[in-house]
Amino acid sequence: MERENPQPPPVEGKAGFSGTKDGIQSSAVEQALSGLRQDIDAIDAQIVSLLADRQRVVGRVAALKKSHNLAVYHPAREEDLISRRRQQATHTGLNPDFIEEIYRTIIRRSRVAQTGSMALKSVRSDGIVLLVGGKGGMGCYFQACFRRAGYQVRILDKENWPEVQSLCDGIDLAIVGVPIDVSCEVIRSIGPFMPAKAVLCDITSIKEQPLEEMLKAHAGPVIGLHPLFGPTTSSLDKQIIVATPGRDDNACQWVLDQFATWGAVVVRSDAREHDDIMGIVQALRHFATFAFGQFLKRRKISLSRTLEFSSPIYRLELGMVGRLFAQDPSLYSEIIFASEARRNLLKDYIQSLHENLEMLENGNKCLFQKEFQKITEWFGPFGEQAMRESTFLIDKLIERF
């Protein structure tokens, strides 16, 4: 039977001894790391505590604004704060862009908190609001907004139209929020029941024709509104509402003040300018997105497979396409087919695509580059702004996904 050879004791420089030394070093490193991590945890706890202190002060700011009917959004104050924090970051050796990103998030949460508080604020005590078409998405949204602020809210829909006279009695504001194709008919129908001093407004995505009908139907204050957000919006903070004047701006001002108090940004425009711009901002953009999605579907493209190969910008663009098709098609058909002017605009867009066929068929790279350069010059400084903003969005997308 063979005898086992005894193992020699570890000698300095041999594997066994160096392993023991490495173990000692590793333990020391872990202890050092543990101490540093405890320091970081303590600092993080202080940061959270300070943010809680800040939020309590924000609550007092909200209460003060609420008592004096001041708007939540104060852009000059926010930009001044960001500028000072960037300077402080530079002086202390921190990246100012990093600090700006943190503070924009903090400021946003502060505004949302203030907006939540201001949602309970009414600029017209004991006001009565009638929502015409109040059972739709936006009708339900505004119903919640006005009720939270203490207004008496009445709903007028198809089912209770016989009660129109009693529902209109004593109201301060009527908001018409019905499909575009019936908005003018509804406006004409409700006009005779409006109290003389009540404000009549609509919230459709076209303004020229409904505004004209409201001015005919009601002799009192008239204003056109277009909320550029949907019923799933969680907060009115910095949400845009376009206001197109109709009659007696002073009498209508309290309506705009109410939305501003809730955190919205009111943009003023005449009806024609609004409709021209919305043709591009909404109709053309939604139709182009629809066409892209339709093309992908017809080519039977595997969306999941393309995402495996995708750049962040493609994921962002595909996300916008998917977002469109996750919503109500009737809403977008109303926007796209709202007027003959919009349909003509979209036909011009399709024609402009056909004009590029010859360039593609001939493989004319020079023409493409010339057109590209012309468009670059036309975009001007916005090109650099777009690059910065889209880079920020891409970075956020990478962080999250």
Predicted regions and their residues:
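Conserved N-terminal Rossmann-fold NAD(P)-binding element of oxidoreductases
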Residues: L130-G133
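An accessory alpha-helical subdomain
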Residues: R268-F401
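Rossmann-fold NAD(P) dinucleotide-binding segment
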Residues: Q165-C168, L173-M214
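Conserved dinucleotide-binding and phosphotransfer motif residues
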Residues: D53, A149, W262
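Extended, charge-rich alpha-helical interface modules
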Residues: E2-G127, A144
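Hydrophobic/small residue at the entry helix of a nucleotide-binding pocket
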Residues: G137-M138
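Rossmann-fold dinucleotide-binding core
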Residues: K207-P210, M214-V265, S269-A271, D275-M278
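NAD(P)-binding Rossmann-fold cofactor-contacting core
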Residues: Y141, R147-Q165
